[in-house]
A protein has these predicted regions:
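Glycosyltransferase catalytic domains, chiefly GT-A lineage
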Residues: 1-158
Length: 158
């Protein structure tokens, strides 16, 4: 992995978020996911009252300046980069970060988890584990990502 050859030694959990799109999670109507290192400072009820009907709500990774694009999630030196760039618009600046996601489980199809894994195998050049791959899938293949509004109720989501 260019630039991060020992990442596997320091980052114990990688790619685990694909399990959030396993068929078993369809036992619930909606899923609210938050990374363990995030802190909740205010009531999250206004977010939970939103209706992500057939959507995945998340904050844009490059907010507030939108100065990075999706290509920043992948190693450009990889032999797979040209194909990736040809197949997907890597210049988008509102790609999402996977630290906080709220979604309708209707977006989970029988093959969603497998398709995420296949994408990661087809394009093994992600420098942020699942985040770039999930953007390809939910932002382009399924087109059901929607940026979570900055203001929800009286609170800011970022």
């Amino acid at each position: 992995m260019p630039g991060k050859p020992n990442r596997h030694r320091t980052k114990k959990f990688q790619w685990h978020k694909f399990h959030l799109f396993d068929q078993k999670l369809k036992n619930w109507d909606k899923i609210f996911y938050i990374d363990i290192n995030m802190r909740i400072h205010f009531d999250i009820e206004p977010i939970l009252k939103l209706n992500p009907e057939n959507k995945l709500f998340a904050r844009a990774d490059s907010y507030p300046d939108y100065d990075r694009d999706l290509s920043s999630q992948f190693f450009k030196e990889s032999k797979y980069y040209e194909k990736l760039n040809k197949n997907y618009n890597l210049s988008i600046k509102d790609y999402f970060q996977t630290g906080l996601m709220f979604y309708d489980t209707e977006i989970i199809k029988s093959d969603t988890k497998d398709n995420l894994i296949k994408l990661s195998e087809e394009f093994p050049l992600s420098c942020t584990n699942e985040q770039g791959i999930m953007n390809l899938h939910f932002g382009f293949v399924e087109n059901n990502y929607q940026e979570l509004d900055i203001n929800v109720g009286e609170y800011k989501t970022y």
